[in-house]
């Protein structure tokens, strides 16, 4: 008796017929990591409705560049978290876990151009060294004609970088430069 691969005492009776393949290992999804922007938009939508309809989910999914099914699962998980929090707060006599206060939303108002002094040779105005031009081109008159966000850096998908993060980075850079190059 000749046995073909996959046949034998362990597989007899439960063996695969001709043309059938062994079941493939189930594919496991990697955890989705959401950006700050995506989480902000998803939370805003959750505040508006805990049970958005399919059209709302599709619209939101397109806005945050996620598949609709990821948005749907996020809402399922968020509702479960919300129910847990409600159960803890209305409590069964047990001490509820303290909720952390939500961080206040930062205003997106743009400060006046060049409000942070970075380096003397980077801003508009007269050159620090006579005879050498400034490195940042247009002065305040030209910047004003384009509007406050005309030169804001953006991600590839078009979302402007968070202004608060940029301010913090600029401040840290200025402080580091002050330490490295003490004033003369």
Swiss-Prot record:
Keyword Protein biosynthesis: no
Region described as Disordered: 1-33
Ranges annotated as DNA-binding: 27-86
SMART domains for the chain: HOX (SM00389)
One record GO biological process: regulation of transcription by RNA polymerase II
GO molecular function, one term: DNA-binding transcription factor activity, RNA polymerase II-specific
Alphabetized UniProt keyword annotations: DNA-binding, Homeobox, Nucleus, Sensory transduction, Transcription, Transcription regulation, Vision
GO CC term, one of those recorded: nucleus
Low complexity: bias regions: 1-10
Cell compartment(s), UniProt: Nucleus
Record InterPro entries: HD, Homeobox_CS, Homeodomain-like_sf, RAX/RAX2
Entry's transmembrane regions: none
Pfam families: Homeodomain
Residues annotated as signal peptide: none
PANTHER family: HOMEOBOX PROTEIN, PUTATIVE-RELATED (PTHR46271), RETINA AND ANTERIOR NEURAL FOLD HOMEOBOX PROTEIN 2 (PTHR46271:SF2)
Comment block on domains: The Homeobox transactivates the Ret-1 element in the presence of CRX and NRL.
Protein purpose: May be involved in modulating the expression of photoreceptor specific genes. Binds to the Ret-1 and Bat-1 element within the rhodopsin promoter.
Subunit structure: Interacts with CRX.
Protein name: Retina and anterior neural fold homeobox protein 2
Protein species of origin: Pan troglodytes
